[in-house]
From Swiss-Prot:
Residues 51-72 are annotated as: Disordered. Inhibits fibrinogen interaction with platelets. Acts by binding to alpha-IIb/beta-3 (ITGA2B/ITGB3) on the platelet surface and inhibits aggregation induced by ADP, thrombin, platelet-activating factor and collagen. This is Disintegrin cotiarin. Keywords: Cell adhesion impairing toxin, Disulfide bond, Hemostasis impairing toxin, Platelet aggregation inhibiting toxin, Secreted, Toxin.
């Protein structure tokens, strides 16, 4: 939704303020394959294992999303 930084559906989420749908102070992310304990995983961390001839997908260190490698 517009203006939301995170999914405010779960009040127990330690990264997201359920009342405002904003990240809590100090949090970089609230969910995603490249989010761990409210912080972006480091660049190069595997977020999706290789399948077939495609290599592993790896976090960028700048986002909670797991980017698809260029071979997909």
């Amino acid at each position: 939704e517009a203006g939301e930084e995170c999914d405010c559906g779960a009040p127990e989420n330690p990264c997201c303020d359920a009342a405002t749908c904003k990240l809590r102070p100090g949090a970089q992310c609230a969910e995603g394959l490249c989010c761990d304990q409210c912080r972006f995983k480091g660049a190069g961390k595997i977020c999706r294992r290789a399948r077939g001839d495609n290599p592993d997908d790896r976090c960028t260190g700048q986002s909670a999303d797991c980017p698809r490698n260029r071979f997909h």
